[in-house]
Amino acid sequence: MERVIVQFSIPGMTSKVYDQIWDELRKAGQSHPAGLHYHVGAQQGDNWLVVDVWESVEAFNKFGETLMPILVNAGVNPESSKPVITPVHYEYDAALVH
C-alpha cells in the first residue's frame, strides 16, 4: 500500500462547524479512523484547511463513505471541497527518532 496525503480546503467553514463534524464522526464510530496516520485542521483565510496522511487511498475512500454524508449535512458543498490526493514521497516522524 502507498501512503497518501489528503488535503481539503473548504470554503467558508468555521472551527465551530469543524468541531461539529468531528462530533458526528465520533457518534458514527470514527474516533480513530482505520488507516489514518495523521490529521491537522486549521483556519486559512476564509477556508478551513485539512491535511491528513493515510495508509492508502483505499483506507481514505472507505472513511469517505462515512465522512461525505456528514460534510453534506453540515452544509459543505462537495463540488467546491473535493480533496487533493497525493502519493507520499518521504515521511519523517520525530516521534520515532530516539
Q: Where are the regions a protein language model picked out?
A:
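Short S/T/G/P-rich N-terminal loop/turn motif that feeds into the first structured element of a domain
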Residues: 1-51, 55-69, 76-98
